[in-house]
């Protein structure tokens, strides 16, 4: 639904607001007949997971210095986290075929948030490796469960819009993560973003 308006003269220029949509109406158009609330929750989970990953990437030099790591040690940590995420994705995808995907998504979000928070409390390299590997649960749960939930909830004719909106969360998280992480780390230290995100 568009806002009806007449062209207006502003500063010598004609403007027309007839193409401006209310944000809720735009979201409703994306969701179509599917559950808007569910789509927004999955969008939020996807964005926050990306915030965490991009925060770790932007704060890697501070983390490296805190734990006296070289570049090789830091890259080993990052590769270990990626390998754990890949291994977990296969296991979680199998679980999602047999069990409630909503419950798996909730459990994954809770586990991810606990591990992400604990990243800010890490006192040793081994502990940091364990909690960062545990935080890989977020990505491992998001891909198999979110995709199948969206496919179940939305009809084929609206899936392109829905999946595009859901994937936009990655760009939102990747864009806002470094910004917020940088500001928080500058003010409070590298641990703060993980305690807040």
Residues covered by each model-derived region:
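Extracellular/periplasmic helix-loop-helix junction of adjacent transmembrane segments
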Residues: 59-86
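Helix-loop-helix hairpin linking two adjacent transmembrane segments in secondary transporters
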Residues: 166, 170-197
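Interfacial helix-cap and linker-helix signal at transmembrane-aqueous boundaries
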Residues: 63-64, 95-96, 183-188
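Cytoplasmic helix-loop-helix junction between adjacent transmembrane helices
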Residues: 131-171
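Extracytoplasmic
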Residues: 38-69
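Helix-breaking motifs and short loop linkers at transmembrane-helix boundaries and internal kinks
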Residues: 68, 100, 121-127, 138, ...
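Conserved MFS/SLC helix-loop-helix module at the cytosolic interface between two early adjacent transmembrane helices
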Residues: 87-123
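Residue-level signature of mid-helix packing/kink "hotspots" within the transmembrane helices
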Residues: 54, 82-90, 174-175
């Amino acid at each position: 639904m568009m806002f009806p308006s007449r062209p207006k003269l502003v500063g010598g220029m004609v403007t027309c607001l007839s193409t401006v949509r209310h944000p809720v109406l735009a979201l409703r158009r994306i969701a179509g007949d599917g559950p808007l609330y569910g789509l927004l929750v999955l969008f939020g989970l996807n964005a926050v997971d990306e915030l965490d990953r991009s925060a770790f990437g932007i704060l890697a030099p501070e983390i490296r210095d805190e734990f006296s790591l070289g570049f090789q040690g830091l890259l080993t940590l990052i590769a270990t986290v990626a390998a754990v995420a890949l291994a977990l994705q296969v296991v979680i995808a199998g679980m999602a075929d047999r069990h409630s995907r909503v419950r798996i998504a909730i459990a994954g979000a809770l586990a991810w948030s606990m591990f992400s928070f604990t990243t800010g409390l890490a006192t040793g390299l081994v502990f940091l490796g364990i909690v960062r590997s545990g935080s890989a649960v977020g990505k491992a749960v998001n891909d198999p469960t979110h995709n199948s939930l969206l496919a179940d909830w939305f009809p084929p004719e609206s899936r392109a819009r829905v999946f595009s909106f859901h994937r936009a969360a990655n760009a939102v998280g990747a864009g806002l993560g470094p910004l917020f992480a940088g500001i928080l780390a500058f003010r409070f230290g590298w641990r703060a973003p993980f305690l807040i995100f």
